């Protein structure tokens, strides 16, 4: 059944992309089939999404990060592996791999009108990105450019995607600890679909202990052919350094 909609496949998977704004900040993605343009139908959806990232150093300037999260409304598990490499003081290069699986029930919730899908959908992604981070007074500015190769099942063709994101963060002293509020905007481009997705994301990174941080955040996503999604994200970041 899913192959009927394969030519409309455009991602809508909560992708855990780790972004360096002084402290780790996790963002996301959910890949799902899109129906043809529908201007009427079901409205936006709220998706509570817990996640966990564990980071450990491999050697000086190179880390290994394992992230997992669950998009409750769509019943989607996601796993991502990142290997950030600190190339210069301001530039980090990160190769990464992401896997997600969407059940048929999740596919039917993502679009303005139910797809009638009876099969699940899975996708593998290999990505490479470069993130430039620099300070302006106490603000931390970041700009990330990412290339994603999407390997999709069934009749859907493998395709490439560009993702561009700009972000800002600012440390804030609270009760003897340094909290870090942040905000970012990201856009997505694919050769056939053009600029087909936007994300606005905001939250705060809160240190709990030296090796543990808590990050509540909110992300709004608009994508071509899918319902708008309001992600309510609750994450834990564990650093073994």
PLM region descriptions:
Residues 57-61, 142-184, 238:
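Detector for outer-membrane/organellar transmembrane beta-barrel domains
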Residues 58-66, 89-95, 137-141, 174-179, ...:
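Repeated loop/turn-to-beta-strand initiation elements of outer-membrane beta-barrel proteins
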